[in-house]
């Protein structure tokens, strides 16, 4: 046999008497997108070749020659000198074909011993997803640090807290920002948890039932940094939980980010004037010279819809598949690649946009003077000091709110006489409970908005970030 006799052929064509149609090659191929897995594919092949050598399935010099050849293929791809061709079908066949051209078809053909593309692609894709879990979690941690540091400077910046998008109770900007920090902390924990749960190597599972070759799967797992091997070969090649999990985790993060961006969009409007987004992260209008648009925040909000769609797409693809591998599963990658790229860019630019944003403390304080934010404090005063049932206190306070509105005032602006005219229980001591800063500071319960509680929350995050 000549050295490169089979190097140009499809690796599976022995059983076929007709060549593949051009239509099939174009429809069936995944090389245009799974070439993104070249690093993982070659790393997996090198570990597999090393294991075959250690187990005596390949001679030591054969194993070393294959690994050296794979390094050459890797160097070519990194240098942009590798020609990806549609007829090569996928990254696995493209790499093996080029390897066979470099070291010879006979030796190159030995690499696939005790391996199927089913477990090979499971390894490549899982390896990629695991690495991205760590990369994403690192960016989220940076975002949490930014929010935590910003919160330290705004413990006394008073603003309205909202329910139903109506003014509810006075809170600090620090407290509001920390709410997002703790959201993103949960996101971080989901990515880390997914990494830990899925950190098992599927390589060596072969097509679906294992292999008769005397391999040692733990060698490959250790070489690639996996914690262990998967336990069932059929499950290993059928499993895409790790892909679904990263898509879900990305969707939840992007949903949280979208909520934050929605607020930044609103807060940067003239109606609110709570924040000014840096020129570096804003755009203008082609026709209106005065415009300063929060396009970064709007794009993150918009991209959230797309990543949510990627999750639903893969869930739908997987829902009806019998065991084990099916070609439908080739559709697992593009959505993941897209969602991963989206969260990496979104988390990075969101962090920078928040770092450079300027908050208007005066406008935030002014906003607290409407909406009767101290109403709950007045009701609580009646319960604590006058021993009035909360429902009765609620009714009395509601009358006080109505009185304020009839006078064109905020509840916090009523004087002693005006309060007393509503109900005799609203005595001169009640007036101090209408103060908005006092209202904020009264909420000392764990997780509350009082400075003492906020400082505890900041300390929790600081300790966690170390």
UniProtKB/Swiss-Prot annotation:
<dbReference type="Pfam" id="PF00206">
    <property type="entry name" value="Lyase_1"/>
</dbReference>
<dbReference type="GO" id="GO:0005829">
    <property type="term" value="C:cytosol"/>
</dbReference>
<dbReference type="GO" id="GO:0042450">
    <property type="term" value="P:arginine biosynthetic process via ornithine"/>
</dbReference>
<dbReference type="InterPro" id="IPR009049">
    <property type="entry name" value="Argininosuccinate_lyase"/>
</dbReference>
<dbReference type="GO" id="GO:0006526">
    <property type="term" value="P:L-arginine biosynthetic process"/>
</dbReference>
<protein>
    <recommendedName>
        <fullName>Argininosuccinate lyase</fullName>
        <ecNumber>4.3.2.1</ecNumber>
    </recommendedName>
</protein>
<keyword id="KW-0028">Amino-acid biosynthesis</keyword>
<dbReference type="InterPro" id="IPR024083">
    <property type="entry name" value="Fumarase/histidase_N"/>
</dbReference>
<comment type="similarity">
    <text>Belongs to the lyase 1 family. Argininosuccinate lyase subfamily.</text>
</comment>
<dbReference type="Pfam" id="PF14698">
    <property type="entry name" value="ASL_C2"/>
</dbReference>
<dbReference type="GO" id="GO:0004056">
    <property type="term" value="F:argininosuccinate lyase activity"/>
</dbReference>
<dbReference type="InterPro" id="IPR008948">
    <property type="entry name" value="L-Aspartase-like"/>
</dbReference>
<dbReference type="InterPro" id="IPR022761">
    <property type="entry name" value="Fumarate_lyase_N"/>
</dbReference>
<dbReference type="InterPro" id="IPR029419">
    <property type="entry name" value="Arg_succ_lyase_C"/>
</dbReference>
<dbReference type="InterPro" id="IPR000362">
    <property type="entry name" value="Fumarate_lyase_fam"/>
</dbReference>
<comment type="pathway">
    <text>Amino-acid biosynthesis; L-arginine biosynthesis; L-arginine from L-ornithine and carbamoyl phosphate: step 3/3.</text>
</comment>
<keyword id="KW-0456">Lyase</keyword>
<dbReference type="InterPro" id="IPR020557">
    <property type="entry name" value="Fumarate_lyase_CS"/>
</dbReference>
<keyword id="KW-0963">Cytoplasm</keyword>
<keyword id="KW-0055">Arginine biosynthesis</keyword>
């Amino acid at each position: 046999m000549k050295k490169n006799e089979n190097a140009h052929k499809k690796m599976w064509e022995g059983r076929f008497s007709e060549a593949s149609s051009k239509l099939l090659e174009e429809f069936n191929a995944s090389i245009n997108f799974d070439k993104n897995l070249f690093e993982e594919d070659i790393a997996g092949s090198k570990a597999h070749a090393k294991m075959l050598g250690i187990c005596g399935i390949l001679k030591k010099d054969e194993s070393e020659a294959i690994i050296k050849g794979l390094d050459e293929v890797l160097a070519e791809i990194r240098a942009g000198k590798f020609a990806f061709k549609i007829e090569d079908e996928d990254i696995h066949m493209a790499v093996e074909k080029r390897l066979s051209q470099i070291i010879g078809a006979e030796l190159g053909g030995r690499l696939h011993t005790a391996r199927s593309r089913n477990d090979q692609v499971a390894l490549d894709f899982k390896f990629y997803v695991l690495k991205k879990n760590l990369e994403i979690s690192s960016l989220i941690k940076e975002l949490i640090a930014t929010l935590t540091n910003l919160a330290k400077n705004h413990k006394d910046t008073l603003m309205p807290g909202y329910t139903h998008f109506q003014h509810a109770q006075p809170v600090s900007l620090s407290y509001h920002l920390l709410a997002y920090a703790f959201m993103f902390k949960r996101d971080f924990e989901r990515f880390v948890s997914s990494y830990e749960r899925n950190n098992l190597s599927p390589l060596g599972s072969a097509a679906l039932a294992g292999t008769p070759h005397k391999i040692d799967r733990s060698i490959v797992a250790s070489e690639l940094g996996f914690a262990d091997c998967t336990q069932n070969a059929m499950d290993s090649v059928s499993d895409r939980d790790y892909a679904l999990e990263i898509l879900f985790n990305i969707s939840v993060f992007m949903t949280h980010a979208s909520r934050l961006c929605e607020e930044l969009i609103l807060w940067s409007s003239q109606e609110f004037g709570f924040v000014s987004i840096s020129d570096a992260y804003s755009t203008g209008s082609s026709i209106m010279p005065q415009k300063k648009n929060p396009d970064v925040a709007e794009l993150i909000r918009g991209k959230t819809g797309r990543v949510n769609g990627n999750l639903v797409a893969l869930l739908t693809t997987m829902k009806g598949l019998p065991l084990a591998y099916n070609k439908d599963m080739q559709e697992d990658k593009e959505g993941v690649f897209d969602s991963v790229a989206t969260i990496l860019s979104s988390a990075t630019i969101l962090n920078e946009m928040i770092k450079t944003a300027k908050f208007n403390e005066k406008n935030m304080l002014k906003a607290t003077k409407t909406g009767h934010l101290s109403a709950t404090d007045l009701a609580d005063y009646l319960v604590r000091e006058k021993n009035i049932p909360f429902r009765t206190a609620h009714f009395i306070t509601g009358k006080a709110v109505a009185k304020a509105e009839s006078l064109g005032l905020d509840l916090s602006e009523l004087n002693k006489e005006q309060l007393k005219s509503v109900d005799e229980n609203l005595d001169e001591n009640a007036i101090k409970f209408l103060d908005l800063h006092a209202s904020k500071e009264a909420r000392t319960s764990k997780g509350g908005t009082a400075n003492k509680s906020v400082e505890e929350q900041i300390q929790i995050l600081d300790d966690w970030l170390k």
